């Protein structure tokens, strides 16, 4: 179990990877984001084919963050997101790699049993190009 006191600025955690099938993308889109470029593989469309909803990308990243990081830490939730960027489309049958970078570690002045970190969740394609980035605040218990 990791606590606030165990984190240092600059630490990076590998969260694992994911890949979506065309069926995954279309199924999510039908339910949550039914825009044409999430529903059909149209080479003449604005993205040159089928792409995942940015919200599906975020959901996949969140799942990796929870399974590989938050479930092994004294997480007390999140007060919010500072910055969110959808930089490149996520496509079917491509493996994407996620990581989490610690950017700030701040013990609470008012509640000494906890503190916050600012972390960056990143998703990269097979060429290591950044496709998704989220800077979020998280609260962690202290030892």
Where are these regions (language model features)?
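HotDog/MaoC-like acyl-thioester-processing domains
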Residues: 1-9, 86, 90-95, 99-143
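Hot-dog-fold acyl-thioester-processing enzymes
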Residues: 1-80
């Amino acid at each position: 179990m990791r606590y606030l006191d165990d984190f240092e600025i600059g630490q990076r955690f590998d969260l694992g990877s994911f890949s979506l099938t065309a069926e995954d993308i279309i199924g999510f889109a039908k339910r949550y984001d039914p825009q044409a470029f999430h529903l059909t593989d149209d080479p003449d469309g604005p993205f040159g084919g089928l792409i995942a909803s940015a919200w599906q990308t975020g959901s996949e990243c969140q799942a990796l963050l929870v399974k590989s990081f938050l479930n092994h830490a004294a997480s007390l939730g999140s007060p919010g997101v500072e910055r969110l960027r959808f930089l490149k489309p996520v496509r079917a049958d491509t493996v994407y790699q996620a990581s989490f970078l610690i950017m700030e570690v701040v013990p609470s002045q008012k509640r000494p049993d906890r503190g916050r970190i600012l972390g960056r969740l990143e998703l990269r394609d097979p060429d290591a190009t950044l496709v998704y980035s989220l800077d979020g605040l998280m609260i962690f218990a202290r030892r």
